[in-house]
Regions:
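N-terminal secretory signal peptides that target proteins for export/translocation
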Residues: 1-11
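Bacterial N-terminal signal peptides
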Residues: 13-24
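Peripheral terminal and inter-domain segments
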Residues: 30-32, 372-636
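Short, conserved catalytic-motif segment at the N-terminal edge
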Residues: 35-95, 117-119, 126, 134, ...
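Active-site SXXK
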Residues: 46-49, 63, 69, 96-124, ...
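Short, surface-exposed loop or secondary-structure junction motifs
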Residues: 71, 77-81, 136-355, 368, ...
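Catalytic tyrosine of NAD(P)H-dependent dehydrogenase/reductases that use a Tyr as the general acid/base
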Residues: 95-98, 192-194
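Short, well-ordered beta-strand elements
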Residues: 350-367, 475-479
Length: 636
């Protein structure tokens, strides 16, 4: 009797559990709007996009949503020509998807792998004709697999040469890559560091082994095959496509100002494409359908699967790289978003796919506020239509005992290490700070520990995995969904705080030299011999350092866009002064010895004050040397 009752009770319990699970699934389904309903999608997209475009001054944008091989929603926002009020047409209007162009380069590489002309695991130097990658790490050559996963070990770079706005500066791809070959700062296969140069190199390799210039190759083997009539890597655009191009605009108070078409031809395979939203759906349809859109095939199904299965990841608990494609964190478990984002100085774009949902989202927004619209829209769309449950996590009570091991500043391996732009590394570090509530502040967001060296955003699903060495010391971190952005733990002298203190202290010291010269002008003129020479050394140090900071400040005042297009002449001129300042620092150091030995100055404090000038001068000399400001090491 009791056994029967117990069995019935157990059966009822199991039914209740099953019923609860069904209700939970239904509730989740009900909570997610129907992404196959065009009216529902349009209402959401309009609500986010229109407001943000107006608020952030984005003159044009486009969104396309595809599911099950069918375009559910596509719509243009704003105007491709503001003056003529020409509206955006998602079928024909071209946008600049930036690094989404790389996916066409990776498909081209894998086509040549299919044809037996390329091997992912051999030294790429055997595919190069006019130059070779430097043998920085003997016995460790760079391979196409390294290039596809951004683990080639190259430093990053781009100021003054990656994107230009003058077609007269276009040079052949091989010449451009030879001229701008980056330093190999790491052995291949160890660290991820996004590389436009390496991607462009992959495009050159495709051209070399196929015997067809890269732009023509993509046109013949992808665009023509898929019927992508409104897509091109050619710069400037052919006239028949240029009339459909969303113009590039800046924004001054109350009006848009047209700017030149961005030229990326010198590194074209990394980002030179222009394409319409509907043409991007054709590309997506092939990727979601085993490499073919109907009878139009660009890859074998097994090759596409290889792209998705093989790649690189630093920590299996966070998403890393497929072969060229980024694995994204959007959507619930099983959604497995992959694709790429892309940005030029004018356009910000997203291209996301899910095989499980047979789904694609493409968006692109232009203008100075395009990035703000992009940031507000993309994640919000996935969270709306493909929500991910966010559970409340209580921070471990004992986390405070180990929180300090994570504290510090972390710099990206996607940085420059040999040229003037390396200084950006010191200004863009990711700061990690333990908080009293047993959480970590990583950048602007709070995270809670969920596993050993693994943290989840408190009010979101973003994850960060820290890395440690054999001794258990934290050495770096990787962010879920950003597989090409590995960070290393920065030494104190590579942080913004230290840099600010060093430069600020030196400026105060140099200001003191000028003030002292002003109120002791008569005493200065009365000085004789070595003592006057010592004072002149202080003037030389203060003047050369101050002039560098003044001219460099003017040189960068035009903003990052101007620096991307070309290094301004005034910034080039400013680089004379670090050389003079370093020589003056050495001179001042020698004179400081003389100052003490000869007993110059009215008191011991005067001699200490003079030594402080030497200290500031030598500190700035180190600053110039370490951050590659001593000389004219830039590409133009």
């Amino acid at each position: 009797m009791s056994r029967v009752r117990s069995g019935v009770t157990g059966h009822l319990a199991r039914l209740m559990v099953a019923f609860a699970m069904v209700l939970s699934v239904c509730a989740q389904a009900a909570a997610a709007p129907d992404v196959t309903n065009p009216a529902v999608v349009e209402a959401f997209v309009d609500g986010v996009v229109k407001t943000n475009m107006q608020q952030h001054h984005s003159p044009s944008g486009v969104v396309a949503v595809m599911k099950g091989g069918e375009i559910i929603f596509s719509k243009g926002y704003g105007f491709i020509d503001v003056e003529k009020r020409t509206p955006v047409d998602p079928a024909t209007s071209l946008f600049r998807p930036g690094s989404i162009s790389k996916l066409f380069t990776w498909v081209s590489v894998m086509q040549q792998v299919e044809r037996g002309k390329l091997d992912l695991d051999v030294d790429v130097n055997q595919y190069l004709k006019t130059f070779q990658i430097e043998d920085t790490w003997p016995g460790q050559p760079v391979t196409l697999r390294h290039i596809l996963t951004h683990t080639g070990g190259f430093e990053d770079g781009g100021l003054g040469y990656l994107i230009i706005d003058n077609p007269d500066r276009i040079i052949p791809l091989a010449e451009s890559l030879a001229k701008s070959q980056p330093v190999r700062v790491n052995p291949p296969g160890e660290h991820t560091a996004y590389s436009n140069w390496a991607t462009a190199l992959a495009g050159l390799i495709v051209a070399n082994v196929s015997g067809v210039p890269f732009n023509d190759y993509v046109q013949q083997n992808i665009f023509d095959v898929l019927g992508m009539k409104y897509a091109s890597f050619v710069e400037p655009l052919p006239p028949e496509l240029d009339v459909h191009m969303a113009k590039a605009y800046g924004y001054k108070p109350d009006q848009y100002t047209e700017i030149n078409y961005e030229i990326i031809s010198n590194f074209g395979p990394a980002g030179a494409m222009a394409a319409s939203a509907h043409d991007m759906t054709r590309f997506a349809r092939a990727l979601l359908n085993g490499g073919a859109d109907g009878d139009n095939r660009i890859l074998k199904a097994e090759t596409l699967q290889q792209i998705l299965d093989e790649g690189f990841v630093h920590d299996e608990r966070v998403r890393g790289m497929a072969l060229g494609f980024l694995e994204r964190r959007f959507g619930p478990d099983g959604f497995d978003n992959f694709g790429h984002d892309g940005g030029t100085t004018v356009f910000l774009s997203h291209f996301g796919l899910s095989l499980q949902e047979d789904f694609m989202l493409f968006s692109s927004f232009s203008g100075p506020g395009g990035g703000m619209v992009h940031g507000a829209f993309v994640k919000a769309f996935y969270d709306e239509f493909f929500p991910r449950e966010i559970t409340v996590i209580t921070p471990p009570a004992d986390f405070a005992e180990r929180a300090g091991r994570y504290a510090g500043t972390f710099n990206s391996w996607r940085s420059n290490f040999s040229k003037i732009e390396s200084l950006m590394r010191a200004l863009s570090g990711l700061k990690v700070t333990p908080l009293p509530d047993n959480t970590l502040m990583i950048g602007p967001k709070r995270y809670v520990e969920v596993d050993n060296n693994l943290f989840r955003q408190v009010d979101g699903y973003e994850r960060v995995a820290f890395q440690q060495d054999a001794d258990g010391k934290i050495t770096g971190l990787v962010i879920d969904g950003m597989g090409v952005m590995q960070y290393y733990r920065a030494p104190f002298y590579e942080t913004a705080a230290f840099t600010g203190i060093l430069v600020g202290f030196s400026l105060l010291v140099f200001l003191g030299v000028f003030l002292r010269l002003g109120y002791q002008w008569a005493a200065y003129r009365a000085l004789q011999g070595a003592e006057k020479m010592a004072f002149r050394a202080s003037i030389a140090v203060a003047a050369s350092n101050t002039l560098f900071l003044v001219f460099a400040g003017v040189g960068v005042s035009g903003g990052m866009t101007a620096l991307m297009y070309e290094i301004p002449a005034v910034l080039k001129f400013s680089l004379i002064f670090p050389v003079l300042a370093t020589l003056a620092a050495l001179w001042h150091g020698v004179m400081s010895v003389t100052y003490w030995r000869e007993g110059f100055g009215a008191s011991v404090w005067a001699r200490v004050r003079y030594s402080l000038v030497s200290l500031a001068a030598l500190a700035m000399a180190w600053f110039y040397i370490y951050w590659n400001l001593l000389g004219f090491n830039y590409f133009s």
